[in-house]
């Protein structure tokens, strides 16, 4: 009898179901919930998140240095960077406008009885927002945050933008050395990169356990009762995310001769993992690895993916625009066209460059709502369902960043079509065989 092997996607799905069942039980049995959550489930979930954070920085640095040293052309790198930022700005602006449009059409906040809504303490987000605003966050603030004063400190804090900036400079400096001096160090960084990808595969074996624990904690703490009063908001956010992924990104992919549906099938493991953990970082190493295998050069993949985690959060910006209009409708505030334009422009700035901030979507909303006169207290009403919405928007962030790599590779005429087709046959062939079993 053959040994039955389940793919990572099936293992994570099974872990999600078990986590939901256990969390549902614990939600109504508070006597056993507190001890299990504090002593077993939360630590088990935190271990997985810590493992992911442990491998992200070495992978980003090593792949960027290898990729940039391989390019060795500052002008070419500047061109890639400019195209990447332009693409990110256009796509996230489309996400903001789509979110505001859908919220105005479907009116998720209209007719909601505020007395039936539970509130959650958001003081921790308010203090974070004050810290971000006091640091002059904006275009110049973001530019200033690119340059690290201490790269070791930035690595310890996981600050992605300074790490990218340093790695690019280091790669350019390395590429200018004579080959006899350059190649040994490039070989070292290439070995580090390959080793860290092996470590990633080891960490992924623990993913089902981490997912089980994280889902169980979420359901145990919030249950499902908090969803019903906000069902229109939850459904609209999920519809908007599906629409953006399949239609908006689908059109972008088609214009580039790609298929977003094939991309989603290739990323099925990563999407399930990102959705269940609500963490984009959990799949960053595998996105870099898969997009390289799918035909994008390492010089583009290693730059676009980590940069996208700060500038191309499609799911987050889509959610933020819907949430802003929802809160306005909740309070009966009818925003004018001019106020909505201000909202779009404000979100275009505030949603960039603070990906490392805890509760980033809430921080962005707190920094944005006041600009159009929307009460900040309204965020307390949606904080209880934020985890559920965070799972969906994280999955869209993953698809958006993966597609961005392929778009920039196509734009630079560096996309390897033969390699991509071979990878499609390999991955989708395995997918079809698994489905038949």
UniProtKB/Swiss-Prot annotation:
One of its GO terms (molecular function) is amino acid:proton symporter activity. It is found in: Cell inner membrane. GO terms for cellular component: plasma membrane. PROSITE patterns: NA_DICARBOXYL_SYMP_1, NA_DICARBOXYL_SYMP_2. SUPFAM superfamilies: Proton glutamate symport protein (SSF118215). It comes from Escherichia coli (strain K12). This is Proton/glutamate-aspartate symporter. One of its GO terms (biological process) is dicarboxylic acid transport. It comes from the Bacteria. It is a multi-pass membrane protein. InterPro entries: GltP, Na-dicarboxylate_symporter, Na-dicarboxylate_symporter_CS, Na:dicarbo_symporter_sf. The keyword Transcription does not apply.
